[in-house]
A protein has these predicted regions:
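Non-catalytic C-terminal accessory region of glycerolipid acyltransferases
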Residues: 2-123
Length: 123
């Protein structure tokens, strides 16, 4: 959604934080699903780092399809910032976005696994 990307860039241009879920929706299971390239694209375009965040124990709080919220122990793990490549001539090849997305997926899996371990979930 081009309009949404423009709004996100405007938020980042103001120096404000932006939260994205690069999988596009809540997922279940032990692995991070394939990511959309939007987070990497925005990081490269705005020249800002991506901070991977992993959540553990949230599947039981509000299971997909549920309208109820259940009290459960959850954990949040914040990873190290991932700095996007900087284009010397103002443009980067499309592969830079793909590579940053792949790096983000690995980092998200690490923090996701740590967050699950903190609440006693097996990985």
């Amino acid at each position: 959604d081009l309009e949404a990307l423009k709004r996100c860039l405007a938020v980042l241009a103001l120096g404000e934080p932006l939260v994205m879920f690069p999988e596009g929706t809540r997922q279940s299971g032990p692995t991070v699903h394939p990511l959309f390239d939007g987070a990497a694209y925005l990081a490269i375009k705005a020249g800002v780092p991506i901070v991977p965040v992993g959540f553990g124990g949230t599947e039981g709080v509000m299971p997909k399809g549920s309208k109820m919220i259940y009290p459960r122990k959850c954990s949040v793990v914040i990873g190290q910032p991932i700095f996007p490549p900087i284009a010397q001539d103002g443009r980067l090849p499309r592969s830079a976005t793909t590579e940053l997305t792949a790096e983000l997926r690995v980092a998200l899996q690490v923090v996701f696994d740590l967050a699950k371990q903190k609440v006693g979930q097996t990985i």
